[in-house]
Amino acid sequence: MVRLPRHPGAVPDLAHEQRWLPRLGPLLPVAVPEPVGRGEPDEDYPWSWSVYRWLTGANPTAGAVSAPRRLAEDLGRFVHALRRVAPQDAPAGYRSGALSERDAPTRAAIAELGGRIDTAAVTALWERALRAPRHEGPPMWSHGDLSPGNVLVDGDRLGAVIDFGCAGVGDPAVDLMPAWNLLPAAARPAFREAAGADDAEWARGRGWALSVALIQLPYYWRTNPPLAENSRHVIAEILGERD
C-alpha cells in the first residue's frame, strides 16, 4: 500500500510512522502498518511518501458492529498494550496534553454550531469534563486518533489499527474515544475494563471524544458527510449518558 500526502502538513506524520512503527508493532496484539519503503520528492511529486505492507480488513460503522463486546475487548487490549510500551525517547502525543488546552477551540465550535445541537447541554458536559482530575502518572503511549476510519475489522474481531501520525506519550485518555465514536453503550464496560481506565481517566476520555466531535462537526459539515455523521453520533451518545 502506498500513502501519498495530499498537503505538506501530512508529511511529518509519515516520517513519524517510519521511525516509530517498527518499534511499536512487535509489542502490540494486533497488526499495525509495517513500512517497507520510502519515496523521495522529485519533479513529479513534491513530498516524501511511504510504502506499507497490505493489511486486511474493513472500517467498522458506529451502530452497526456485529460483535460489539468482542471488538470492545480487542480494542481495550490494544490500548492497554500500547500504554505498556516504554516511553523513553518518545515524542509527546498530538492529543496527549491537558484537556484544558482544548477549551477555547471547543467553545468556539459550540458557538459555531449554534442551534444545530443542544449547546447548553454540551457546554455543561464539556465543563464537567474539564473538572476531571488531571493525569498525574508517568507519560504513556497513545495512538491519539482511534476513530472508526483508523480501525480495521476482520470478521468480527479487531484486525488492525492504522494511522499513527498522532501517536506519542503523555496522558493516554484520548485512546478511550472508541467508547463513544464506535462502541454501543452495552459494550463500553468491557472496553473500559480491558483498557484499565479509572474513573478520572474515563471522564477525560469522554471529554476528548466530545471535544473532537464538536470541533469536527462544523468543519466537516458539508465536506465530509461520514465524519460529520460520526461526530453527531458521538455527541448523541454522550448526551445520552447524562446522569
Regions found by a protein language model. Name each.
Residues 1-98, 112:
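ATP-binding pocket architecture of kinase catalytic cores
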Residues 60, 73, 166-169, 177-243:
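Helix-rich C-terminal or lid/interface subdomains of diverse kinases
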Residues 17, 21, 48, 103-107, ...:
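A general structural signal for well-ordered alpha-helical segments in protein cores
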Residues 2, 35, 126-176:
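Active-site acidic catalytic loop and adjacent metal/ATP-binding pocket
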Residues 11, 68-72, 96-103, 119-123, ...:
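Short, structured helix-loop boundary elements
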Residues 50, 77-80, 93-132:
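Active-site catalytic-loop/activation-segment of kinase and kinase-like phosphoryl-transfer enzymes
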Residues 16-19, 23, 77, 124, ...:
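Generic recognition of well-ordered alpha-helical segments
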